[in-house]
Amino acid sequence: QDTIREARITSDRASAVAKTQTGHKRLDKLDFIYGNVVFSSPDIIKSLQNLPGVSAGTELMSGLYVHGGEGSDNLFLLDGVPMYQISHLGGLFSSFNTDVVGGLDFYKSGFPARYGGRMSSVVDVSTRDGDFEEFHGSFMIGLIDGRLQFEGPIIKGKTSFNVALRRSWMDAVLAPTTAYLNKKNEDGEIIGGNYVFYDLNASLTHRFSAKDKLSLKMYYGRDRLGLSETYPETEEAIVGNGISITASGEDELETDIKWGNLICSLNWDHTINEDIDIRTIAYYTGSYADVWYRWKDWQFETKEIEIYDALNETNISKVSDIAATTDLDWRLDGNNRLRMGASYQHHIYNPSRNSAIDNDGSLLETSSGKRYTGDEFALYAEDEVSIGKLLNLNAGMRYVIFSVPGKFRHRLEPRLAMSFRCSDNVDIKASYTHMNQFAHLISTNYLDVPTNCWLPSTENIAPMHSKQVAAGVYSRLPMDFRLNVEAYYKTMDNLLEYSGSNTLFPPLDSWETSFHKGKGRA
């Protein structure tokens, strides 16, 4: 029996907001496949780095610095759920597997009121449901990783699944390489190295009717880096009567770093009628980083005594959200589209550090850290309206409440965007946005490394906020070319910069007093 695969049609009405907003870019699967490729694998973040107003930071890394902001100022959403860690291999690969990605919306200005929580940009990534009619999949091998994807119906026309797994295979190369180098090393030094990353995307979708759909989605990503070095040492000690004795020992250095993400969400899409849709999401999102290292310095004193100094330290950073959101999309008529919604997030920040120093048999153990919690509640409304044939407006307001023990804050965030059609081929656009950010990425360096940790605005640390004005001319040229010229002015307040001594790990007990507060303009 011949079958025709499902056809997907995107209406012009559904993209109305994209026509009004400044600084907006919509990317689909073909943009990733034929866009930037890293070691033969498509990469979402690398594709965004080529856009005007976006900087990559360190060469080849997955940094995203938008309109003068930091990498931590960007809101990354996977099917409406925030992600805190968005890269593998220290930033060389992004955490988004393009085998399951359906498309994304990227905003660097003109943010609609439905988005909030970060100052500089929004990367809203959506994944595909599984095929409801037939089974199919793909298998790809890259220079550093391999990808496997499979989807299909469980109950034809009703229930489907979509599963994708990506894994690096660098560990298969590192093990024999280090073994060969150790064999060739004549001074007895032994080195060890191992690195692996993998991520899993899975979704299960059931259609109860033409008006109700329930989806269970999961993402799990993990990196692990292990390094070790053993140095042989030979030392001489005088034991009496001028007699010297020679003994051999080893100095040791070992590091184990693990970091990753876990996202679980339950999505309910309900259609009230042909003009009103409601989406409700309940989710858990969490990110963790665990950095452990051990160092031992062997020394020989006398015939009977061998001593050593040793350090064993563990640094753990965890952040997680338990949250729910609901959004209503009401198409009042062909010229007016109203969106409104509410969200609640319970944030948990849990950084800790434990160290043990053994100095010639004298053990000194220390620990530091604190558990922080915060509650964030938001309401928003935005109206997309066409006034005649030439003018489109998107006006919205977002109200945010953020509460931590000892401090209650609330903010209004006005949003306004407009588009005026000068001719069939030329549009003028302008926007104003006000954003607040209540989460701070605490770092003692400028790299995206697992030693950084997320902490909330507290009684003593105010939230960051930005105001941005943008305007531009957007023109359509012959042969489907586009020429866009856009300018922006952005101010940022309550920015944090580490003011302590050079160290790899940020201070946990005194972090609120270890940073300078400043302002920024771009």
Model-predicted segments: where are they?
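Short, acidic, small-residue-rich periplasmic hinge/interaction motif at the N-terminus
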Residues: 1-36, 45, 71
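Short acidic/polar hinge/loop motifs at secondary-structure boundaries
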Residues: 34-36, 81-107
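Extracytoplasmic beta-strand/coil segments of soluble accessory domains associated
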Residues: 39-40, 45-82
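Hydrophobic, lipid-facing positions within transmembrane beta-strands of outer-membrane proteins
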Residues: 62, 119-121, 135-137, 144-148, ...
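Predominantly transmembrane beta-strands of Gram-negative outer membrane beta-barrel pores used
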Residues: 75, 103-112, 120-128, 135-187, ...
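Transmembrane beta-strands of outer-membrane beta-barrel pores
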Residues: 127-129, 143-145, 154-156, 167-171, ...
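Face-selective signature of the C-terminal outer-membrane beta-barrel domain
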Residues: 205-223, 253-407, 421-424, 481-485
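Outer membrane beta-barrel strand-and-loop segments of large Gram-negative receptors
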Residues: 321-325, 367-372, 378, 458, ...
